[in-house]
Amino acid sequence: MAVEPLRVLVTGAAGQIGYALVPMIARGIMLGANQPVILHMLDIPPAAEALNGVKMELVDAAFPLLKGVVATTDAAEACKGVNVAVMVGGFPRKEGMERKDVMSKNVSIYKAQASALEQHAAPNCKVLVVANPANTNALILKEFAPSIPEKNISCLTRLDHNRALGQISERLNVQVSDVKNVIIWGNHSSTQYPDVNHATVKTQGVDKPVRELVADDAWLNGEFITTVQQRGAAIIKARKLSSALSAASSACDHIHDWVLGTPEGTWVSMGVYSDGSYNVPAGIIYSFPVTCKNGEWTIVQGLPIDDDSRKKMDATAAELVEEKTLAYSCLT
């Protein structure tokens, strides 16, 4: 029995992240080695020629799983029948720009894309927002696509989650696949809280707490947190371009685990619509630890939160509430 292809939308597809992401999707890294895909690529009219170049390369790569490519500058055409939407397109902050100006540009982009998805996407479409400010862009999308269930709209904090795993694995000189259950709480910004209080490392077949193995609270409570929070800026400084390869890879991880499930005993971080869990204000998109099964995520409940964690979780929530207010002020 042939597997029906899934339609995957990538917006901003001619950009850096898009260029890294589309071959990963076409190779089956996002949805699995047996799942055929039809790629829908959207970008703005000035990027139309570059977008066509990406389409040519996708044809040239002869990916067995790639059953078709739609490359367009028309949002309605791009969204038609898509099962998964990865929203990479947005308005980047340029030097000298006020936060409100950037927010205003992104609010109008995400309002328009929300209505295109609302009208044209497949009924159970899963949406992942990557473009910054990711949490608030996802919130705007949710507001203006009321027929898409709120549980189907998420934002990317898996990049931060993976960055945290990477830092622990480097510090302890262990395989990154043996580190699990870090948490990114809050905003995909420098206020995010990378929490290792529940994280473990597998050593000689046994899961041991990261805190115990690292045995350096000063590092875990200080440099580790700031390194993860500021990793994006460090990569821009080194590469003169933003992190594209790691962003694309973590977007694949996010969708892969959401659709195909997380391993037993492992959670991941996803920016999802808050229901008030862990006393986080409802009505914002906030990164929580989640497990996934049968295409649905569930917030991991009942983790003990110490006073220091509480303060950091509240600070990043406050920033998200403030961003929400700013975004809504751009709507009037």
From Swiss-Prot:
Positions with a binding annotation for oxaloacetate: R99, N132, R163, H188, S243
Catalytic machinery residues: H188
One GO process term, biological-process aspect: tricarboxylic acid cycle
Chief location category: cytoplasm
SUPFAM superfamilies registered for this protein in UniProt: LDH C-terminal domain-like (SSF56327), NAD(P)-binding Rossmann-fold domains (SSF51735)
Record's GO cellular component terms: cytoplasm
Residues where NAD(+) binds: Q16, I17, D43, G90, Q113, N132
Subcellular location per the Swiss-Prot or TrEMBL entry: Cytoplasm
Cross-referenced CDD domains: MDH_cytoplasmic_cytosolic
Top-level taxon in the UniProt lineage: Eukaryota
InterPro entries: L-lactate/malate_DH (IPR001557), Lactate/malate_DH_C (IPR022383), Lactate/malate_DH_N (IPR001236), Lactate_DH/Glyco_Ohase_4_C (IPR015955), Malate_DH_AS (IPR001252), Malate_DH_NAD-dep_euk (IPR011274), Malate_DH_type2 (IPR010945), NAD(P)-bd_dom_sf (IPR036291)
One annotated GO molecular function: L-malate dehydrogenase (NAD+) activity
Assembly with partners or alone: Homodimer.
PANTHER family named among the record's database cross-references: MALATE DEHYDROGENASE (PTHR23382)
Identification of the protein by name: Malate dehydrogenase, cytoplasmic
